[in-house]
Design a protein with these regions (language model features):
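Cytosolic juxtamembrane helix at the C-terminal end of the final transmembrane segment
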Residues: 2-13, 69-84, 141-159, 208-226
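Alpha-helical transmembrane segments of multi-pass membrane proteins
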Residues: 21-39
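Selected alpha-helical membrane-embedding segments in polytopic membrane proteins
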Residues: 47, 51-78, 85, 94-99
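Alpha-helical transmembrane segments of polytopic membrane proteins
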Residues: 50-63, 123-137, 173, 192-206
């Protein structure tokens, strides 16, 4: 790998981004599971004033941390691994687009409903985000397969983690919902609740492991580049 010198400690930034993502991903998981179980953080008098603030911070961290990690990973990659660089750029572009669209919807800059129907602009933006999401998942799989076949150590472990993210997405977003819909019968509501909790735990675990290994890979590349 070619040598790189950094004016700032981007490895430390990646570490902070990874820790922030892990903490707030676990918080989001607990929040969602408690919601499905009929519990609420708002029942606590101590958490009532800070819950809305925590939710806003959680949303921002979970949107911005992946941008930072993928951006740093892309920046640290040597020029010779063009496939990984392109995949990283696609992933970063997807997360940037998701963040921008999320802010547009949250701040009501885009009208979602009009006369009881979804507006054309909202449909176009939602379709664009869904398409980019599918492309990013494929890019993640391609990057994972490349890392597993061409690299060793932490880079190979990152490849395995990215493949696990794809498997989690395939199972939790596509296979499990269809299976529950056709097999659950009269217990669909309870089955969907269990499926949602399992999907949340699986997906969160996969992403936490992937971003942890991405930080390790960035650290490895940074050590080589010094």
């Amino acid at each position: 790998m070619e040598r790189k010198s950094y004016s700032i400690d981007i490895t430390r930034i990646a570490q902070y981004a990874m820790y922030a993502y892990c903490i707030f991903a676990l918080f989001s998981l607990a929040f969602s599971v408690c919601g499905q179980a009929g519990l609420s953080f708002r029942t606590s008098p101590i958490l009532i004033p800070i819950s809305p603030i925590l939710v806003i911070i959680k949303q921002l961290v979970l949107q911005l941390a992946p941008i930072a990690l993928w951006g740093i990973f892309r920046y640290t990659l040597p020029a010779g691994v063009k496939l990984l660089r392109r995949c990283s750029e696609l992933m970063g572009l997807y997360y940037v687009l998701s963040f921008i669209l999320g802010q547009c919807f949250n701040l009501h800059l885009v009208t979602m409903m009009q006369n009881g129907q979804i507006t054309q602009m909202a449909s176009i933006l939602t379709w664009t985000e869904s398409t980019m999401g599918l492309i990013s998942v494929i890019a993640s799989l391609v990057a994972g397969c490349h890392l597993c076949s061409k690299h060793r150590g932490n880079m190979r472990k990152l490849g395995i983690a990215l493949i696990l993210v794809f498997i989690a997405w395939l199972l939790c977003s596509n296979i499990l919902p269809v299976a529950v819909f056709y097999l659950a019968g009269n217990t669909q509501q309870a089955a969907f609740t269990c499926m949602y909790i399992i999907s949340m735990i699986t997906t969160t675990s996969a992403y936490i492991y992937a971003y942890y290994m991405m930080y390790r890979a960035i650290k490895t590349i940074g050590c080589i580049g010094q």
